[in-house]
């Protein structure tokens, strides 16, 4: 029915993706060889959102794995669910992008992109009613960022009316994996603003904090971080895959969350997050979920919602619970924290309830917020970008692949515009409508 084609690009994307498929397979009772071992009809009823059924009743993930070097793919293949993927869905080059966005977007990646699009077409044609695409990638590297955004643009061209969701790992405030991260991220955001429908922002530092502070893991591994991300990814589509009292899908999410087309960068969170030992001491109740969900420590990107205001938000509850109680609690939190919600969008919460909780929990909730505080993230990257770009540091790596300095300037100003748009709506009141229109006209003439 409402199929989603999943694409994972680059090392980060493939590692998150591999974890995600472990979680999804587990939810649907599919074992690592693709056999169904579940115990409930509901697990299999709408399994085709993410899986194709192959000969002999095997379930194969509708996943396309893309990378410019074979290393990560080999480790996915060797991983616990490595044998479940269809071999011709692996598309990889040999050269690598070397953390260079231009290599991913213009040279190496551009050579491989047609091979990927062929696989995308094949997978999409096999769908009854394709709902959209979800892409896992990071914005700091070469393949996930450069080639990932190239893929998004090309798929957008071919399927303009399908949803395009990305789970994007954004650079962290303090920890940097690569020196040229600000360049890669800014160039990627420039693409995502134009071509993606929904971007779920995740960053490693916030994930580390959750693992460290909330889950009390002394030395979290990437596996732990990726597990958190995959909880959110599975939560976003739980309503598609399991029956529920109030359904949501990718398009409903977009319609409810995006007040202006460019402002589609979301904060995500998940509840309950408790350390392994302390679960038995806490009751899972709807109020507990709601309060934890809105807690800034639960956000998977390093932006503090208390520094901005929510334009819109969505909460997806899973498990047996009373919808009345959910509605009361959501109303309650909006009244209590009314200063954190913009007043010119009345009741700006979208709620959905799905009956089947994640494995091992009685109830859970996924939170997606469109908050103006996400501008902190872009501001931070923008400052790092300008610091390097002012001296033209590292630029030769990009111009050597045929890029123009002009592109950097454009990307920078696009991201700065995005920041000021968020800022403008953060400060807006109910009765200031007229002023804005004049300002906008003025902005176009500059």
From Swiss-Prot:
Residues reported in the UniProt entry to bind GTP:
11, 69, 138, 142-144, 204, 226
- GO BP field: microtubule-based process
Q: Which cofactor does it need?
A: Mg(2+)
Q: Which Pfam families match?
A: Tubulin (PF00091), Tubulin_C (PF03953)
**Location (main, coarse):** cytoplasm
The role this protein plays is:
Tubulin is the major constituent of microtubules, a cylinder consisting of laterally associated linear protofilaments composed of alpha- and beta-tubulin heterodimers. Microtubules grow by the addition of GTP-tubulin dimers to the microtubule end, where a stabilizing cap forms. Below the cap, tubulin dimers are in GDP-bound state, owing to GTPase activity of alpha-tubulin.
Q: What is this protein called?
A: Tubulin beta chain
The species is Giardia intestinalis
Lineage of the species this protein comes from: Eukaryota, Metamonada, Diplomonadida, Hexamitidae, Giardiinae
